Amino acid sequence: MTRLLIFSVIAALPLLVQAEAVSSEMETNIPLRAQIKAKESTLIASEMNARINQLKLHDGERFTEGQTLVAFNCSLEEAQLNKAKATLEKASKNYEVKQRLEALKSISALEVAVAKAEEGEARADVQIAQAVLSRCNIKAPFSGKVTDVIAKPYQTVKIGDPLLEILNDKSLEIEFMAESKNLASLAVGKKFQVSVNETGKTYTAEITRLGGKVDPVSQTIKVYGRITDKADDLLPGMSGAIALKP
């Protein structure tokens, strides 16, 4: 009986060694799903109640930083700025006259102080009008591509109405979820490979940062990375798999 038991254990050893090897291999290459996202993306919304004069970009078209994305009809705002400037000029001249009269002891210091305050108020009105007018042209905060056009030319919009969505497709990052038990191996700068489904290619990437917390339910943490290879064919929204070695 004892011999039979020893024989059974010896016979099972190759299977145990094989199972351990498979387990070790699985731990060495942990398959994870990854998604490619744009680091910079935003929804452009209206900051004023106005009619759109210019909205020439279409979905998929490129733009450069500082380029006008949307322009509004701001004839009223321009007129208000001109009026504010004229009022400031009048207030400034009045203040100058008051100062001369004070030097001649012809008026009181109170009248001079009032004239100075009126000039300051007029100057503030000019600044307000300039700030309002600056919202008439929405400039691109970065270079990139249009992903959705919501508004239409000559449409009248209100404050907060969405106009278009944009992103920087040249600044991409990889995002995936990793088990928190492997946190020690997820060092910033660690290299890994990502195979993208849409292109059928494999790219070299590296970890750039980790999420700020571990999900207590799934026991996972967000990991972010960047592709170090030339990857002009990648677009936000593509996905793939990575094999991250511990």
Model-derived segments and spans:
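Short coil-to-beta-strand transition motifs
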Residues: 26-31, 139-140, 195-204
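Surface-exposed patches in structured soluble domains
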Residues: 35, 49, 53-56, 62-68, ...
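Structural microfeature recognizing short secondary-structure transition sites
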Residues: 116, 147-148, 202-246
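Alpha-helical coiled-coil segments
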Residues: 76-131, 149-152, 174, 218
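Sec-dependent signal peptide recognition
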Residues: 1-9
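A short, hydrophobic beta-strand micro-motif
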Residues: 20, 165-168, 188-198, 225, ...
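N-terminal beta-strand block that forms a small beta-sandwich/beta-barrel module immediately after a flexible targeting
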Residues: 17-49, 208-209, 240-242
